[in-house]
Amino acid sequence: MAAAELADTQLMLGVGLIEKDTNGEVLWVWCYPSTTATLRNLLLRKCCLTDENKLLHPFVFGQYRRTWFYITIIEVPDSSILKKVTHFSIVLTAKDFNPEKYAAFTRILCRMYLKHGSPVKMMESYIAVLTKGICQSEENGSFLSKDFDARKAYPAGSIKDIVSQFGMETVILHTALMLKKRIVVYHPKIEAVQEFTRTLPALVWHRQDWTILHSYVHLNADELEALQMCTGYVAGFVDLEVSNRPDLYDVFVNLAESEITIAPLAKEAMAMGKLHKEMGQLIVQSAEDPEKSESQVIQDIALKTREIFTNLAPFSEVSADGEKRVLNLEALKQKRFPPATENFLYHLAAAEQMLKI
């Protein structure tokens, strides 16, 4: 097996099964290998089967303490051999961000469970993918890990959609991401939250960092503690109560109302000037061009972002220990940039860990 394939098969961490029975009880039925009580409780919360009178969400995903979770939820048809089960969820945990890959695999596992009513076939398929990167089944479909390149998962969202909703205000999101600030996104529909939040890291394409994404967070003490351990993040919520938690965000996005709010404590670092106006104009111009694809928009923003780092380069020097480049603040001040530009470059250097300690 090729090294790349081997690495890919080692990304999955576990598989689990949650059922809702005819009495309305939701039970963690089975998993392979074992899991912790904390993670089990989290996944029970995420699967939405415990929510009374709420719509089913066919597929949800998120991250908790560097473990990604992917959950497909199925309503059991009357014809199924699962006579005492009304709904069930298949849960996959993994080390990588790749919603399309794990949605495809969980759908196959769901079809297997509907047909056989036993986790045995699911476990066989899980182990086949874990060890060989493939599972084949005539009646349930085939799955091949290498068909789902992680690099395709990154640009899968739509920056054009974000710009059509927020226009020039998109630059606030770009600035917050550049400065590694905390962005909280609210919408009552989890599908809207996930689609929007997964796209945001593409605004800082040079980092290729989707570990900042926490697309489905509950106002739960353990989840919030895990979130607050991160320096900067993009976190999605479906509970409007999060708007009353300014300790959780520097920028709050109310998707339902198309509003972006900068928290008072973040306003100084997020002060906008000529540099931001130019960036905003470029983002809008590129995104509104019908001839340009999503990937071209990402590349346009990435090129302009590189220019910003080029602006910063003349004011950096090798640190005393020779290990990294640090900001020469005096040189930056002598350049006499407009205050907002100087302020932004200083905070960008801080985000890139270029300040002298």
Swiss-Prot record:
Annotated uDENN domain ranges read 1-140
Listed GO CC annotations: late endosome
Its signal peptide is none
Domain named cDENN: which ranges?
159-299
A single GO molecular-function term is: small GTPase binding
Biological processes annotated in GO:
protein transport; regulation of early endosome to late endosome transport
Which branch of life, at top level? Eukaryota
List localization entries. Late endosome
Q: Does the keyword Oxidoreductase apply?
A: no
Domain dDENN: residue ranges: 301-357
Q: What keywords is this UniProt entry annotated with? A: Endosome, Guanine-nucleotide releasing factor
Q: Name one Pfam family in it.
A: SPA
Is Signal among the key words of this record? no
What InterPro entries does UniProt report for this protein, alphabetically? FAM45, Tripartite_DENN
The record's annotation in PANTHER family points to: DENN DOMAIN-CONTAINING PROTEIN 10-RELATED, PROTEIN FAM45A-RELATED
Q: Report the function annotation for this chain.
A: May be a guanine nucleotide exchange factor (GEF).
* Similarity-based family: Belongs to the DENND10 family.
Protein name in UniProt: Putative DENN domain-containing protein 10 B
